[in-house]
């Protein structure tokens, strides 16, 4: 991000020199060239965050965590993180900020309409999203429905803002990560032998749900074209480079052809 800001400042500075300087007439209003030796560095490659279908299934299979004695909450942070991770995945990568702020929807509707907080203010279409509630995710949508009707989900009744909500999710994801590592019965060597092309994640982040949705959608099993994934993620860059950052490429289908 800093790189792109500096590149923009350099571009504006160069445009200003072209506009206000006239070398033929000797009129140099902007003599400085602070960016003459500056080179824009290429950003480091973004680490793929997607989890494998196997890890996703393990998250689905996690049972409810025992609540502490005297707890007034009807779910623990681990349960919250599990359910919100699956909500995000099932709703095509909905961000935590949007889960928290999503407006109330028509009672008979099976499509969620909302504006992505991250990009709404920068887009002419206000980053409007239309996501169908599939039968597999409908029980979770119902579980967390806002009883007041103010918003779609009731998370705002438990967490006063995005920071406290994200904090609870991050703590819950850490406990999910610990639980998966404690119960996992397949080590890295066995994964390699089975043809897994991606190591187990160091730590599961909430954004991994969005990356996982994109990666699984583009996998050999589903074969959804990249442009459809690009639109579903609400990306607008014509070259789809942002979408490429989300998708962890798999070569498993090529290995299958080689061994076949």
Locate each region found by the language model.
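N-terminal core-binding DNA-recognition domain of tyrosine site-specific recombinases/integrases
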Residues: 1-14, 68-77, 162-168, 203-204
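N-terminal DNA-binding recognition helix of tyrosine site-specific recombinases/integrases
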Residues: 1-34, 94
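Long, amphipathic, Lys/Arg-enriched alpha-helical "connector/arm" segment
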Residues: 36-80
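Short, polar N-cap/turn motifs at the start of nucleic acid-interacting alpha helices
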Residues: 105-113, 203, 223-245
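Conserved small/polar residues in nucleotide/adenosyl-binding loops
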Residues: 252-260
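Active-site/catalytic core of tyrosine-dependent DNA strand-transfer enzymes
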Residues: 12, 56-57, 132-200
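Conserved tyrosine-mediated DNA breakage-rejoining catalytic core shared by Y-recombinases
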Residues: 101-142, 237
